[in-house]
Amino acid sequence: MPELPEVEVVRRGLEKWVVGASFGEVEVLHPRAVRRHAPGAADFAARVSGCGVTEARRRGKYLWLTLDSGEALLAHLGMSGQLLVQPRHAAAERHLRVRLPLTARQGHDPEAPQELRFVDQRTFGHLLVDRLVDDGTGTGLPSVISHIARDPLDPAFDEDAFAAALCRKRTELKRALLDQSLISGIGNIYADEALWMSQLHWATPTEALSRSQVATLLAAVREVMVAALAQGGTSFDSLYVNVNGESGYFARSLNAYGRNDQPCARCGTPIQRETFMNRSSYSCPRCQPRPRHARA
């Protein structure tokens, strides 16, 4: 599933190619793509068609386009969702779910019309239209994600509040990092990478962490995510691409995730894979020793 860096790469592409344009007649080709929009596909198309796009924003793994109607077009990419900006005459992708034609904006060729396409092979992603609520800083946030915590790259992220909440969790450290109501944007890949960088085991009890360990962990999370952003995110297959259909290449820089039995870049010990929450966790048994009082 795309995590913060991948979603931010898509957001930046939307900011470049879609903000300032307006939508033409929206066409929903597969109703499952808008299943979270309770009034249905026809209402979704009617609410988006003709609207102008004023900004592209993100919180954690969610992104949205603010519309001049005062509402937001919210997107969650799920496992395989893609938002692509394509020439309107380009052949339809096999798993094209929603077409959102774009009017020409300043600097774009009106003779080469484009459209935003939502493509989703596994149909776990979705689009919906939602009202905006104040997020406490005077900025609008779609109401359905108002429970999602700020992410570590958000300028308004409160490190002290996070540290206190983390220690109150009394759970495994990785489980806490994956809790989007505590800190958003982190998934399996970047949790493993940040834990490797900070030399903490995923089963470390959160209540046992010192303030300096939390600070080291947050610094690692930010460093990993900034590095991933610079490389366009992590792509293991063709399911994650940016708005121009290009894959990221941070997979070449991973130190832990997916590197079972390969030598640790820091000490040479083979990376080990363990099962956690029905998924895989990767760590170095020497650099990240399992704590004596591990929670799992």
From Swiss-Prot:
Residues in FPG-type zinc fingers: 255-289
Give yes or no: UniProt keyword Zinc.
yes
Q: What's the cofactor?
A: Zn(2+)
Q: Which residues form the active site?
A: 2 (schiff-base intermediate with dna), 3 (proton donor), 61 (proton donor), 279 (proton donor)
Q: Does the keyword Oxidoreductase apply?
A: no
InterPro entries from the UniProt entry: DNA_glyclase/AP_lyase_DNA-bd, Formamido-pyr_DNA_Glyclase, FPG_cat, MutM-like_N-ter, Ribosomal_uS13-like_H2TH, Znf_DNA_glyclase/AP_lyase, Znf_FPG/IleRS
Positions bound to DNA: 95, 122, 169
What keyword terms does UniProt attach to this protein?
A: DNA damage, DNA repair, DNA-binding, Glycosidase, Hydrolase, Lyase, Metal-binding, Multifunctional enzyme, Zinc, Zinc-finger
Query: Which superkingdom?
Result: Bacteria
Q: Which Gene Ontology terms describe the biological processes this protein takes part in?
A: base-excision repair
Q: How is the cofactor bound?
A: Binds 1 zinc ion per subunit.
- Gene3D superfamilies membership: 1.10.8.50, MutM-like, N-terminal
Q: Which reaction does it catalyse?
A: Hydrolysis of DNA containing ring-opened 7-methylguanine residues, releasing 2,6-diamino-4-hydroxy-5-(N-methyl)formamidopyrimidine; 2'-deoxyribonucleotide-(2'-deoxyribose 5'-phosphate)-2'-deoxyribonucleotide-DNA = a 3'-end 2'-deoxyribonucleotide-(2,3-dehydro-2,3-deoxyribose 5'-phosphate)-DNA + a 5'-end 5'-phospho-2'-deoxyribonucleoside-DNA + H(+)
Q: What is a GO molecular function of this protein?
A: 8-oxo-7,8-dihydroguanine DNA N-glycosylase activity
- Enzyme Commission code(s) on record: 3.2.2.23, 4.2.99.18
State which residue ranges cross the membrane.
none
List, alphabetically, the PANTHER family matched.
Answer: FORMAMIDOPYRIMIDINE-DNA GLYCOSYLASE
Q: Tell me, how does this one assemble?
A: Monomer.
Q: Which family does it belong to?
A: Belongs to the FPG family.
What this chain does, per the entry, is described as: Involved in base excision repair of DNA damaged by oxidation or by mutagenic agents. Acts as a DNA glycosylase that recognizes and removes damaged bases. Has a preference for oxidized purines, such as 7,8-dihydro-8-oxoguanine (8-oxoG). Has AP (apurinic/apyrimidinic) lyase activity and introduces nicks in the DNA strand. Cleaves the DNA backbone by beta-delta elimination to generate a single-strand break at the site of the removed base with both 3'- and 5'-phosphates.
**What is the name attached to this protein's record?**
Formamidopyrimidine-DNA glycosylase
Source organism of the structure: Thermobifida fusca (strain YX)
> What's the gene?
mutM
